[in-house]
Amino acid sequence: MLKYAWQSGPKQSNRWLWHLSNQIWKRSYSSKIRNIGILAHIDAGKTTTTERMLFYAGKTRALGEVHRGNTVTDYLTQERERGITICSSAVTFSWNDHRINLLDTPGHIDFTMEVEQSLYAVDGVVVVLDGTAGVEAQTVTVWSQADKHKLPRLIFVNKMDRPDADFEKCVSDLKDKLETQPVCLQYPVKNEDGVLAINDVITLERLSWQQKDLGRSYRNVKLEPSDDLRLLQEKRNELIDQLSGLDDELADVVISTESFDNVDNALIERALRRATTQQKVVPVLLGSAYKNVGIQRLMDAVNAYLPAPEERNQIYDCFGTEVAGKVFKIVHDKQRGPLTLVRILRGEIKRGMRLISARGQAEVVSKLYEPLADEYREVSAVQSGDVVICAGLKSTVTGDLLTSSQSALKNAQKRYKQSLGNTAAKVEEDDELDESDELFAIDPQIPDAVYFCSIEPPSVSSQTAMEQALKQLQREDPSLRVSYDSVTGQTVLGGMGELHMDIIKSRILSEYKIDVDLGPLQIAYKETIEAPALTTLSVEKEIAGSKQSVSITLEVVKNQAELFSLDKSPDNLPNLNTLRPRILQVLRKGSISALERGPRVGGQVVETQIRLHNATIGRGTADSFVMATAAQCVQKLLSTSGTRLLEPIMALQIVAPSERISGIMADLSRRRALINDVLPKGERNKMILVNAPLAELSGYSSALRTISSGTASMTMQPCGFSSMNSVDESLAERRAQGLE
């Protein structure tokens, strides 16, 4: 016994030391990782910025150019043909002893869902602004998405080589339109030939890039006493003053020092990092990606100011040492099959590992790859904080949370609720979904479709292949809706816009070799009830020798909160208390399913609540029969109450020369548009802010080009739904029936 104890002591000690050193190594490894997203309005230069990062990091040997169609991150045929990003892509590269996992995201409003899913995988973002345009419509959208995920940000003001670039206007836009606190770390300067250089606020240096070697090298020279240096010193003092009001460590040094000139650069950078990761400020840098200026300093700022994985996502500590990974993208490779991009939030994923999704689907990881857009390098294991591509996952969908076992998931949910102080043992069946559902990816939020259309294969023999293609595309893109219309017998697609639907058709042809036919695009109208209604439906049938019996009383009322509730009045409560939770769930599911298709144009019924008054279910009645009866009862109620149509409204920003504004506004008035404001935009242009019905905007881009002789530009995005008058409702119904 003594001999055993003497022998086991050193072994246990060695094992403990190994575990400790392993944990220290993992923390050190994680501290050198940066998971970042690149966000921007379309055409701000986001993909060009990404391509320059890859080039200067040594990941690519040649500069990728959007106009040449040879970019790494825009690898789809449609992306290279159109010069826009359609799908998010992940690339990994090293920069100054750090590993950067970068996600290049789409800038077009039709692909907002791609951005949303990508933000679950990153710890910080770089927002690219067009220096000639400032904050634009989609900039505001992606900024609000980053706000939702509480992500620290850097700003890169691109295209500062252009004569019409205005850095001060961009900074002003950040304050006014995004209501943020920008801190400028750089200022632009141009020589006599108009070549862009950068003055660095912290180091008081001028940075000049060498174009002979494609911007690989740059000179940093201390400024000599001059007006430029005095101005830069003032900016440095302002930066120190601003940061000292936000950071105690810097404030203590400022109080004890005689001059701001004595404040060490490293101290400023540490204070700036703390303020950035705490989202108190947003550092602003500048350059020109196309002209190879400023990119290396941008990557330095990513390492210096954006957080490491260990500084984020503490909410996933509830998983302990178990695996927690968020699926943010799925792509289909012809040789490897479906490839799943996962951000590892906790634990370690190894080749051959068994994983389970929060929806209960078991999977086995056959291979692991390091991402480089559409190229892959195989690895055996990946640590927490990193991004990895998993092969072999057949049922996982975008947005899923993966962990090591069902018990690990349940324990994590329990710990999470305990951390919130939520120890309630029972939640009423008609309560809203648990607030942890989004965290654990049980109920991902998917935006409503704006357009829909039918899709037909070229022949009956291609039907199965088309359905398989749509199934794969839907796994990649959750915002693509696929349904079957039992009335017409057609497959129906729902999407976020005309471009979205066009890209889906193009991808089915190029990737699956099926020349599908899309029907005319239809507006995705919604419906809402005109008046409350109450009815009772009793149904009895004999199916396969078994008696099926349901009697149910439901009511529909105007309500924007819960979809389904119980009418707990004294008359109904005794009956409701006899209904088992499972039956209540079946009744809820059947009732809500009927709201997916309204009686007028088949639009989703919104702003409507279903109230269950009472229900009597015969012994042995199948759940499917109960569900169908509930749906039938709601359909009857909708016909009784009547519905009104709600049409989608788009928010437009139109920029045009002042002399073209009157013609544009006259055309907008004919399109039932509501002009919100007309603002000056530079010296010669004006910007019109307007809301208009989507139904009136078919072909509007071409019309705007004609009216303005090609001098106007436009962006638009969904901004809600609005009621219609009876004339427009009748016209919408005729369009839905194919009569217009």
From Swiss-Prot:
Domain of life from the UniProt record:
Eukaryota
Chief subcellular location:
mitochondrion
Query: InterPro entries, from UniProt?
Result: EF-G-like_DII (IPR053905), EFG2 (IPR030851), EFG_II (IPR041095), EFG_III (IPR009022), EFG_III/V (IPR035647), EFG_V (IPR035649), EFG_V-like (IPR000640), G_TR_CS (IPR031157)
Example GO BP: mitochondrial translation
For the ligand (GTP), the binding residues are 40-47, 104-108, 158-161
CDD domains, alphabetized: EFG_III, EFG_mtEFG_C, mtEFG2_like_IV
GO CC, alphabetical? mitochondrion
tr-type G domain spans which residues?
Answer: 31-310
Which keywords has UniProt assigned to this entry?
GTP-binding, Mitochondrion, Nucleotide-binding, Protein biosynthesis, Transit peptide
Query: One MF term in GO for this entry?
Result: GTPase activity
Subcellular location as annotated? Mitochondrion
List the Pfam families: EF-G_D2, EFG_C, EFG_III, GTP_EFTU
Transit peptide residues? 1-29
> What exactly does this protein do?
Mitochondrial GTPase that mediates the disassembly of ribosomes from messenger RNA at the termination of mitochondrial protein biosynthesis. Not involved in the GTP-dependent ribosomal translocation step during translation elongation.
Cite the NCBIfam families for this sequence.
small_GTP
Q: Which family does it belong to?
A: Belongs to the TRAFAC class translation factor GTPase superfamily. Classic translation factor GTPase family. EF-G/EF-2 subfamily.
Q: What is this protein called?
A: Ribosome-releasing factor 2, mitochondrial
